[in-house]
């Protein structure tokens, strides 16, 4: 092989020309302590609060405490693989999650990584988990209904698109069931649903995913899961990750429903992290900024103005109480942040009244303006009658001889309570709710025995769906009741009653 000197010199010249003298400067620190999802890192003097840090083995962390001589950071992954003395690099970025259409139908962890065994998620869009909530000028007041399919909610505590409505109650009172029913009811309504499971058993999350899949709801849903077996940092960031995924759709003019199940466990995880980071504890050992933990999350739910595409994100946070104590720290915080609350009671649940909603103390502060007119026309009277019934029922326990009007109100109230009962996974469209509640409010059920009310309702709805489908269609399109529609509804009720009572 002959090598000519001029050839060698030209190669050397090329190499000299290509030489790049740029030096990559990487800010590196050293792990001085690690454990329980927390690491303390020496160095990294220029690290920012909330910055993503890279540990060996592809594990990432997030800077939380910027102290004089070290940084306290939470580890987003297996902290057991990190050792003292390991090198940590700054990334110059903040924590982001993948977003977009590709996420729909998938089950992901708090970092947006798939955990459903269906392969990787093909998306090139990312959003930071922390984002500033839209300001007043970028919002529009809530005016469109978000139907849950549950009579007691849609009539008495209605929810609008862009609202934050808290679901609160003890364990085993059906909080998740209300949320899942609401997701199932969004089928065909062009609403993308996100279910964020925080600190739940993996088997419970699997059960919810199966239920959603069985009802065809995974076609428009994303499940973000941070189970009880995962480290506290994952439980802490999961709601923010779910919110970022929802914001991608909201800012593109779409409608989103997001459920945080539940924020009590997120607050407990944040308390754990804060105490491990040696932050000063406050009431119930929670850190001083636990209110901000939830307010900055829930304020991101909004109904956007037409200039920003008129998208919306409706949030249904769930809070678990202990023995019905809604005056505890976290429940009062979230009640004050949200636009209303749905109280679920153990006593009602055990008495067979499901969904176990206490309609007396449940409120919706903005949803009323989102109700369709037909529902407003029947629900106003329903709310009043139920309030009178509760008052009289408490009074009637002490005396037996009641006057006719009192007896009539008690009779009607019993039937109204019965008609508000509903089976799980059977959400009802709004026009059917209107005709059923119309029958109760106008006294058509007063002479039907209480134990026959549910079978009458089934018979009545069967007739409405088959022979009176045009009447339901009219209510759906006109969205209001007039004298003509009232007469048609009353005629239908009377016909069904005659056949039912025989």
UniProtKB/Swiss-Prot annotation:
Keywords associated with the record: ATP synthesis, ATP-binding, Cell membrane, CF(1), Hydrogen ion transport, Ion transport, Membrane, Nucleotide-binding, Translocase, Transport
List of residues binding ATP: 169-176
Enzyme class: translocase
Primary location group: membrane
Disulfide bonds: none
Gene3D superfamilies listed in its UniProt record: 2.40.30.20, ATP synthase alpha/beta chain, C-terminal domain, P-loop containing nucleotide triphosphate hydrolases
CDD domains with a match to the protein in the record: ATP-synt_F1_alpha_C (cd18113), ATP-synt_F1_alpha_N (cd18116), F1-ATPase_alpha_CD (cd01132)
GO MF, any single term: ADP binding
Catalytic activity: ATP + H2O + 4 H(+)(in) = ADP + phosphate + 5 H(+)(out)
Compartment(s) of residence: Cell membrane
Domain of life: Bacteria
Entries under InterPro entries matching the protein: ATP_synth_asu-like_sf, ATP_synth_asu_C, ATP_synth_asu_C_sf, ATP_synth_F1_a_nt-bd_dom, ATP_synth_F1_asu, ATPase_a/bsu_AS, ATPase_F1/V1/A1_a/bsu_N, ATPase_F1/V1/A1_a/bsu_N_sf
Secreted in keyword set: no
Site (Required for activity): 362
Protein family membership: Belongs to the ATPase alpha/beta chains family.
Function: Produces ATP from ADP in the presence of a proton gradient across the membrane. The alpha chain is a regulatory subunit.
Classification via NCBIfam families: atpA (TIGR00962), PRK13343.1 (NF009884)
Oligomeric and partner information: F-type ATPases have 2 components, CF(1) - the catalytic core - and CF(0) - the membrane proton channel. CF(1) has five subunits: alpha(3), beta(3), gamma(1), delta(1), epsilon(1). CF(0) has three main subunits: a(1), b(2) and c(9-12). The alpha and beta chains form an alternating ring which encloses part of the gamma chain. CF(1) is attached to CF(0) by a central stalk formed by the gamma and epsilon chains, while a peripheral stalk is formed by the delta and b chains.
Name of the protein in question: ATP synthase subunit alpha
Organism: Desulfitobacterium hafniense (strain DSM 10664 / DCB-2)
